């Protein structure tokens, strides 16, 4: 008979449990005890996989999460019709169905608590995996934007992403479908709310 390792103590199980906590609560509000309790293991067991502790666990969790997001965004964009609105709709519906990244909280609260090296690593990953794919859409389709936005595709891309994070909450209290919410956001972003 072979001895099987406790599946809840495997590195993947630790990463999965930690991701649930860090995504919702952020770095500072989560303790290693929260994660260990969720897994039904002793807190000291977490140091087997993450000898440097909470910061290393957080960084690995978030890098994995961001990379998954980047791969998913690329997959979604590869199957959308090649128009700005189709890309934004495909990506937008998917994003509001995911737990929000809470990029603002990460940048304002989580990253300052990390070592400067780890913070820079995560900040670069946030840009590369979450922001750059959307910014690239607006760069590619800048000719469809009003003149004043053509030279700042990052602003309009960031506005789209920030608005989507808000829609994650709005969708819980309204009667519109996810697709209707994203269509309205795209309309508002690309053409504005002004009727005149």
Regions found by a protein language model. Give the residues of each.
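Amphipathic alpha-helical packing segments from all-alpha helical-bundle domains
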Residues: 70, 74, 101, 117-144, ...
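C-terminal peripheral helix-coil segments that are non-catalytic and often amphipathic
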Residues: 132-143, 147-150, 158-196
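Amphipathic alpha-helical segments used for helix-helix packing
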Residues: 86-90, 96-121, 135, 169-172
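Short alpha-helical functional segments enriched in proximate histidine and acidic residues
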Residues: 21, 68, 98, 133, ...
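Solvent-exposed, amphipathic alpha-helical segments
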Residues: 17-24, 71-76, 159, 163-170
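Helix-turn-helix
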Residues: 2, 9, 13, 17, ...
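Hydrophobic alpha-helical connector segments
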Residues: 60, 74-101, 153-160
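Short, basic, alpha-helical segments at the C-terminal edge of helix-turn-helix-like DNA-binding modules
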Residues: 62-68
